[in-house]
C-alpha cells in the first residue's frame, strides 16, 4: 500500500492570498510531523518486546511512517516558502527580528521564542506552564514573567501594525489570533 504523503490535504490551497491560512497549514503539517515522530518513538521503544514476526511488520510500518513524514516536511517547506511570498509577517531567527510590510523590530531571545511558538501554532492556546516549558524550556520562571512578555509582544505588534492579537482566555491560556484581512 503506497501512501502519497506529499499530496495536499483536502482544502489545502497553496495559491492562497491569505497569510493566516498559510500559518494554519504550517501548524497542521508541523503537528502531523510531531505526531508521527511520537508514533516512531513508541515503536522503537516497544520493538524489542515484540516477537520477530511482529518486529518485521513494525519495521515496515516505520518505513511507511518515515515516508509520510518526509512528505509532510515537503509540504511544510512549501508553506514556509509561500508565507514569505505573501509579503506578510516574517520571523528572522538569526537576527531575532519580526518584520511586517517594511517595518521590523528586534526582539529579545524570550520575546522571539514566545512569538515563534504562537505564530507556529495560531489559534492554539498555551497555558503559562506550557509556554515556560515549550517556548523557553525554563519551567522554573515565574508566571508573571510570561504576562510581562505577552504585554511586550502585544505592544510590538501594535507598533508594527500586524493584524493579529495575543489573546488570553481564562482557563485556556494565550493564543495568537489573526484579524480578518480588509
Residue ranges of predicted features:
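Short E/K-rich amphipathic alpha-helical oligomerization segments
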Residues: 13-16, 32-61
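A structural micro-motif at secondary-structure boundaries
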Residues: 90-113, 175-182
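Short, charged, intrinsically disordered terminal tails
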Residues: 2-13, 80-84, 181-182
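Alpha-helical initiation/capping and key positions within long helical/coiled-coil segments
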Residues: 28, 35, 57, 61-64, ...
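Minor-groove-contacting beta-hairpin "wing" of winged helix-turn-helix DNA-binding domains
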Residues: 165-177
